[in-house]
Amino acid sequence: MQKHYTVAWFLYSAPGVDPSPPCRSLGWKRKREWSDESEEEPEKELAPEPEETWVVETLCGLKMKLKQQRVSPILLEHHKDFNSQLAPGVDPSPPHRSFCWKRKMEWWDKSEESEEEPRKVLAPEPEEIWVAEMLCGLKMKLKRRRVSLVLPEHHEAFNRLLEDPVIKRFLAWDKDLRVSDKYLLAMVIAYFSRAGFPSWQYQRLHFFLALYLANDMEEDDEDSKQNIFHFLYGKNRSRIPLLRKRRFQLYRSMNPRARKNRSHIPLVRKRRFQLRRCMNPRARKNRSQIVLFQKRRFHFFCSMSCRAWVSPEELEEIQAYDPEHWVWARDRARLS
């Protein structure tokens, strides 16, 4: 074993013989050159990561909305190093990528130009209209202003119904303006617009339905409001209150004490006769008509999405459509 090692050492130590194996000579030289170059070049510090920046997007009063803006990690030093390593007259990009590279460079130039220009604030979307209602010291009360839905066709339907003979007699009868002053009639037009029916569909019944509902909202005089049935269904409806009165008297007289006391029997018979007399076919018919009227009034109220209150601003806007109309002269302030 010692002889073999001595011969091997002698062969490798002979002059003119490369001690390294032939297969590793080229790789060894490259590795040594790369290690020498790496030792000569100074170690470069890593570029710090770009930090996030925030820019002002919108400014409204004392509130400010911030928007995050990303900063590109590519610096001018990277472009200089890239251009210095390029050989003169040699296109660094492959032939099949030259057109895309040009587009990319053009887009980069445009993006740099756009960054230099000031950023434009986006126009806000249209919001609801708010008007100043009251200003007291440093406090201001804002009120949202609704756009009126009354159209000219609703005014035309209202004017057409004013030509109805029954409505004419009703307005002429109400001289004290307890049921049909200018504000209540303006509410009728507002209800026509909220109900959503076509203008040709409004009839005499719809006029009295809207007027009855307006009196429910603004007035507390039930006796004057009941006169609407007199003009809508005729004079026979006058027996309906009497019917209710006689029925109440009959029930009151038929109490347990009255049943035991025979002296009240003639009175009970009298009340029963009065009840039958006032419950004639016409009275029963008018009573059913009033029940149907109340049912239709509820359906009309539901068709307006249960919005029966009308603001004074909307009433003034309705009257301003035709200020010379004779209906708007029905003002209670002029009577006093």
Curated annotation (Swiss-Prot):
Biased composition annotated in UniProt, kind: Acidic residues: 36-50
Tissue: Predominantly expressed in testis and heart.
Keyword Transmembrane helix (UniProt): no
Record Pfam families: Spy1
Annotated stretches, region: Disordered: 16-50
GO molecular function, one term: protein kinase binding
Associated clinical condition: SPDYE1 is located in the Williams-Beuren syndrome (WBS) critical region. WBS results from a hemizygous deletion of several genes on chromosome 7q11.23, thought to arise as a consequence of unequal crossing over between highly homologous low-copy repeat sequences flanking the deleted region.
Name of the protein in its database record: Speedy protein E1
